[in-house]
């Protein structure tokens, strides 16, 4: 069984929850074309929504850079730093939980960033939607796109690295 953990910001834990529901055999997902790849092969150790710098640092024992923008209690970075922070969080998550696959997401101003870290590779990518957390622009569209893109990439990794079909 392949262990997975997520520490998500702009995707609000939805990547991990979707993987968990398929892994556990929720009936609503039985007709999904990826159901048989995940069910019986994957389990979720943790799926966390961590919007704050303090929460991430406390739970994962990692020191993040100072946010580029002030936004209520949440961290908000520019695109370049979102990519850096997604990598840092995925690495900290993998080290802390010793999972096979760690997934992290973060988004402030830009397309956001997602990192999927396996024992063999690091996959870094963004959503296809520009959003601005500070101004509240395209937040839900960016989130939906990020969740779908991360999930599809996760499935491709299962096929490529683990030979699942």
UniProtKB/Swiss-Prot annotation:
It comes from the Archaea. It holds the Pfam family HcgF. Coiled coil: none annotated. Belongs to the UPF0254 family. This is UPF0254 protein MmarC6_1720.
């Amino acid at each position: 069984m392949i262990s997975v953990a997520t520490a998500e910001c702009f995707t609000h834990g939805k990547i991990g929850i979707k993987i968990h529901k398929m892994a556990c055999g929720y009936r609503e997902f039985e007709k999904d074309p990826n159901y048989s790849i995940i069910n019986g092969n994957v389990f979720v150790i943790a799926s966390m929504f961590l919007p704050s710098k303090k929460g991430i640092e406390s739970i994962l024992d990692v020191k993040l850079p100072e946010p580029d923008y002030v936004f209520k209690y949440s961290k908000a970075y520019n695109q370049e730093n979102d990519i850096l922070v997604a990598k840092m969080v995925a690495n900290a998550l993998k080290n802390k939980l010793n999972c096979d696959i760690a997934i992290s997401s973060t988004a402030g101003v830009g397309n956001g960033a997602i990192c999927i870290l396996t024992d063999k590779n690091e996959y870094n990518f963004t959503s296809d939607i520009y959003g601005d957390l500070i101004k509240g622009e395209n937040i839900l569209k960016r989130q939906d796109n990020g969740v779908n893109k991360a999930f599809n990439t996760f499935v491709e990794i299962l096929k490529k690295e683990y030979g699942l079909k």
